[in-house]
Amino acid sequence: MVTRSSGFSLIELVIVMVILGIIIAASSSRLRDITVNVRINSAANQITSDIDQAKSMSMGRRKQIKFVFNQNNETYTIYEENNLFTDYPGSLNGVVSLSETNNSGVDITSVNLNGTNILTFDKWGTCLQGGEIILNQYKEIHVKKITGFWEIKNL
């Protein structure tokens, strides 16, 4: 009588390794998509938080505050009246860079704020432009003129 030893054969181990490799490869591409989506949501939340803060600060300081979006550098620059707002919270000398934060890989695809790339709050907190800021071609921040209320939509 032939007895078998307990354990796994080399073929069984190779098959298990191949199956694990396929599962890991499939999940890593999905994980990358999830990571990009989290970064885009984080960037949208950062921008909308700054919009809310700028509206409040314009009323509190009784000064005009504006954002100038730069699609090429993935940044927005914040001005108080016509001067760079160098001590704006969360900025580096008035500039907020999406590529230098945890939001790297986020692209400001387009900005259309009444035909410009500038979002302005007057000293009463009134938003002088309305329009859209689009991130990575599928996340839109819609800002309403006058109220400055915003809405984040998937495209």
Predicted features along the sequence, with ranges:
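N-terminal helix-rich module
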Residues: V2, I22, A26-V38, S42, ...
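N-terminal single-pass transmembrane signal-anchor helix
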Residues: M1-L31, D50
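Transition segment at domain starts
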Residues: N41-D50
